[in-house]
Amino acid sequence: MEATVVATTQLTQDSFYQPFSESLEKQDRECKVLKRQRSSSPELLRCKRRLTFNGLGYTIPQQQPMAVARRNERERNRVKQVNMGFQTLRQHVPNGAANKKMSKVETLRSAVEYIRALQQLLDEHDAVSAVLQCGVPSPSVSNAYSAGPESPHSAYSSDEGSYEHLSSEEQELLDFTTWFDRYESGASMATKDWC
């Protein structure tokens, strides 16, 4: 009796899946024929069994393989460009090349900090230049002009009482700026005399 139940069940399952299995066999044959016809085509080399559920009232939308391949290639190129950009940015950010691996977020944060520091440095330089071009030199500034242009250490470095509120970096910047401005004005004067 068990053999009869198993045989009946098997017969019912076979009749239910028969149209579906015939559809799969047909697709396999078509895929093999297409592979033989154009084996060099990349989309046909990746020929996968595509199931159609027409009998169930549902069809799976099929995308164009070449369009998908082009879209994937564009995305790979975009990601590659982004990664190369971050690699270049890491090389220009302080301590970026020294660190073993900075994440993209860390790289961007470091770049923002670096840009802010450079902007602050420019602002300070502009402020110092404006004070020096004002034409009202303080005694320490006039002493600074008496030092030779060959020395980056001007009289500012010995007169620390006039800018105690500045940090050591700001003091060095002020010393260098004073020396550079004197050197630059001396070079422009020599150029005018030479012409």
From Swiss-Prot:
Q: Which Pfam families match?
A: HLH
Q: Where in the cell is it found?
A: Nucleus
Positions of region (Disordered): 141-164
What keywords appear on the UniProt entry? Developmental protein, Differentiation, DNA-binding, Neurogenesis, Nucleus, Transcription, Transcription regulation
Q: Tell whether Transcription is among the UniProt keywords.
A: yes
User: Its principal location?
Assistant: nucleus
Mark the transmembrane ranges: none
The chain positions of domain bHLH read 66-118
Q: Name one GO biological process term.
A: neuron differentiation
Quote the PROSITE patterns the UniProt record gives.
BHLH
Q: Name one GO cellular component term.
A: RNA polymerase II transcription regulator complex
General function of this protein: Transcriptional regulator. May mediate transcription activation by binding to the E box-containing promoter. Involved in neurogenesis. Involved in maintaining rhombomere boundaries in the hindbrain, probably via up-regulation of delta expression. May mediate transcription activation by binding to the E box-containing promoter.
The subunit structure is: Efficient DNA binding requires dimerization with another bHLH protein.
The name of this protein is: Achaete-scute homolog 1b
- Taxonomic classification, please? Eukaryota, Metazoa, Chordata, Craniata, Vertebrata
